[in-house]
Amino acid sequence: MNLEGIINISGKTGLFKIISKNKNNIIIESLSDGKRSALNSNNNANLLEEIGIYTYDDTKPLSEIFNNIAKKENSNKSINHKSSNQQLVDYFRKIVENYDEERVYTSDIKKVIQWYNILQENGLIKKQKK
């Protein structure tokens, strides 16, 4: 799964795609509503391709987590990120069996599931080839 150019921004909901960059700012487009705006250096943004989930062994890249969800859900939407905490934890255990429960919080699980569903809604989750 290619997450290149997809970011999340602290303080803003949803995911954004980088459209272009210059010296002073970055032009981004919301995956939710398609609105474009400028992102300046004061904003804290993270590339999804650089985010990982802690396991007891190492750190799994987000793309691997999304691939696991896509396999489980046949590339369809996953559970709602607003499900109960227990439902989210039970679901995530099926996706990443050995995730580090002391370092991965329920809020992290909610974000991962929300991001997966946003990517799926925007056609960025492809059917897995067998």
Predicted regions and their residues:
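The feature represents the first ordered module of a protein
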Residues: 1-80
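Conserved phosphate/pyrophosphate-binding and hydrolysis machinery centered on Walker-type P-loop NTPases
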Residues: 55-59, 78-85, 102-109
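Amphipathic protein-protein interaction modules
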Residues: 71-97
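C-terminal charged interaction modules
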Residues: 87-130
